UniProtKB/Swiss-Prot annotation:
Swiss-Prot/TrEMBL GO biological process terms: amino acid biosynthetic process; aromatic amino acid family biosynthetic process; chorismate biosynthetic process
Binding, Zn(2+): E173, H239, H256
Cofactor details (free text): Binds 1 divalent metal cation per subunit. Can use either Co(2+) or Zn(2+).
UniProt-recorded name of the protein: 3-dehydroquinate synthase
Claim: Amino-acid biosynthesis is one of the keywords in the record: yes
Chief localisation class: cytoplasm
Chain's role: Catalyzes the conversion of 3-deoxy-D-arabino-heptulosonate 7-phosphate (DAHP) to dehydroquinate (DHQ).
Gene3D superfamilies membership: 3.40.50.1970, Dehydroquinate synthase-like - alpha domain
UniProt cross-references to InterPro entries, sorted A to Z: Dehydroquinate_synthase, DHQ_synth_AroB, DHQ_synth_fam, DHQS/DOIS_N, DHQS_C
Required co-factors: Co(2+); Zn(2+); NAD(+)
EC numbers, comma separated: 4.2.3.4
């Protein structure tokens, strides 16, 4: 199965379960992590033909997605004597995808890169759309670029080695898509047998459908708003809260998808308080998140500090915070005129 991301420039295809032989008349630099290298690198190498192949495995996890790791990656790229015709392959989850794309975008002012995601979260979100970057002390993904891959290959077979926690985190991003753009997908999600899904014993077709439907939705959004000036901001549903939570917990307590799950619950509470969402729909999202074992609560110790952290969000402008809300489910909206009092009141509900 193929989905084309039809951009005015740099259009590319996403191949689902179609990873066959990849031939390059250039050097290839594979960026991965030790776990994925141990599980799947042999499979990938059997499919690649290139002049030379270099492999770099860096520590994986949001706490390592920083400029220090980026410098380590770039040093290995320079030591490999890559040129502008070389190709970087990001082979891993969302962290590897973000860092690999960023490295490709700044190495000698840009070389081609391909994403081969190995987590559900990366398949449904991080690997498609061209957002790259790293975190710093001020927040998440505040240093980065928009830089599109030349192709994306999503293989459902790689997902079979994921833990239930990793699969659930990926499902959170799929739920996000449904809540923003197509609430009928929520009905599909409710019918999934969570036990076989979380054990990765479900049929490959389930993974394929999740990946395909996510990418079809996201590609349409990116085609209309590549640089996130409007519509694409809806893909950040739950993320305004999630990024603060991740930063406050040093990126160690929650997987990204888990933080997004909590963020969606918080965003829904704000939408509920403002009258954009009703209790039944808010509860529906909670029930689906709980179905897959995702967290739905976070204790805010300092409301004022949490509120101030919102202003480091990339969607904030002119001293206003742009919140992405569901209202109703399947129809996202962006609100930049919510009073501080209303925001604080919602945050106090999570103390």
């Amino acid at each position: 199965m193929q989905v084309e991301v039809k951009l005015k420039e740099n259009a590319y295809k996403v191949y689902i379960d179609e990873l066959e032989e990849l031939e390059f008349d250039s050097k290839v630099f594979i960026l991965s992590n030790p776990k994925i290298s141990g599980l799947h690198l042999k499979t990938l190498l059997s499919k690649i033909k290139a002049r030379e192949i270099f492999i770099a495995a860096v520590k994986d996890g949001e706490e390592y997605k920083n400029l220090s790791t980026m410098e380590e990656i770039l040093n290995q790229m320079f030591n490999s004597k890559l040129d502008r015709k070389s190709v970087l392959i990001s082979f891993g989850g969302g962290v590897i995808s973000d860092m690999g794309g960023f490295a490709a975008s700044i190495y000698q002012r840009g070389i081609d890169f391909i994403n081969i995601p190995t987590t559900l979260l990366a398949c449904v979100d991080a690997a498609v759309g061209g957002k790259t970057g790293v975190n710093n002390n001020f927040g998440k993904n505040l240093i980065g670029t928009f830089y599109q891959p030349k192709a994306v290959y999503c293989e459902s077979s790689f997902l079979k080695t994921l833990s239930s926690r990793e699969l659930a985190a990926g499902m959170a991003e799929f739920i996000k898509m449904a809540a923003m753009f197509d609430d009928s997908i929520l009905d599909f999600i409710e019918k999934i047998d969570e036990k076989s899904f979380l054990n990765a014993t479900c049929e490959n077709e389930i993974f394929t459908q999740i990946i395909a439907r996510s990418i079809e939705l996201k590609s349409r959004v990116v085609e209309q708003d590549e640089k996130e000036s409007g519509l694409r901001m809806l893909l950040n549903y739950g993320h305004t809260f999630a990024h603060v939570i991740e930063n406050f917990t040093d990126y160690k307590l929650y997987l990204h998808g888990e933080a997004v799950a909590i963020g969606m619950v918080m965003a829904n509470q704000l939408a509920l308080n403002l009258g954009f969402l009703d209790k039944m729909q808010s509860q529906k999202i909670k029930d689906i998140l709980l179905k897959f074992g995702l967290p739905i609560s976070y204790k805010i110790n300092n409301v004022d500090e949490f509120y101030e952290a919102f202003f480091m969000d990339k969607k904030s402008s002119n001293k206003k915070i742009n919140f992405v809300l569901a209202g109703p489910l399947g129809k996202g909206l962006i609100k930049g005129d919510i009073s501080k009092e209303d925001i604080i009141a919602t945050l106090r509900e999570f103390q």
